Amino acid sequence: MKKFVFSVCALFAAATISFAQDVNEATDYFNAAVEYLNLGDKATALENFQKAYDIAKECGEAGQALVDQCESTIPQLALMVAKDYVKAGDYETAVAKAKEAAAIAAAMNADASVAEAEALIPNIYMQQGNTLLKAKDYAGAIKAYAENVAINPSNGKAYVNMAACYDKLGQTDKAEENYLLAAANGQEKAANKALGNIYLKKALAANKAKNFDQAIELANKSISFNETSKAHYIIGLAAQNSNKLDIAITAFEKYLELDPTASNAQDVRTVVDALKKAKK
């Protein structure tokens, strides 16, 4: 019986010594993490804080103070690491680190940090898209914007930019589709202006190809999104060339109303007068 009691005491003593050693090891990792953080090496600091945390959690009450300190530090530090990758332009790694930060924060019940990390992810995709758009990598930008709206489907600005990329690639159907989504999500003014320009270009091309009825139709479509003097002028030209005098007169007069100081204003007035005389 005495031997058994002795053995149990020895076991508790060994456990106490083990816990003390583990807490010391956790403390060493924690202190190393602080040093790395002071040196600006956030990634290595995070690794050491995580090691300190994992060890301290196994030490029960003896490691609780370290656990608390780690839990108040690690979630925000993980976010800072992700943001550093954003600043460096390494967007793929930034997204991976932001997802990792969200998972870490969730495991530590740091709800505010979870929300911040999750909100960061679509912003990273948006910034990536903007960077690629500026670099004229339109296909890459479309991919990034698509990732953004998959998470945040009400981001009208992403649809505007994605539509602009499709337009640059000559995919006007896709451009129109995304401009309409942009208009439905708070970007109506920018989207309608862009849609007006798309149909204005189509109307110009149709008029140049002597497809006058199509030119009139497309110019009217342009006006339905964004009224411009140029669209009315194209209608006037196409209608004049297809002997639709009433339409031509109305369109040219609207052109002069919208742009009375146009360089060709006097010539257009002369044409209008001639068309009116031709009707008599």
Regions found by a protein language model. Give the residues of each.
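Canonical tetratricopeptide repeat
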Residues: 65-69, 73, 80, 120, ...
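Short coil turns that delineate tetratricopeptide repeat
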Residues: 23, 57, 106, 153, ...
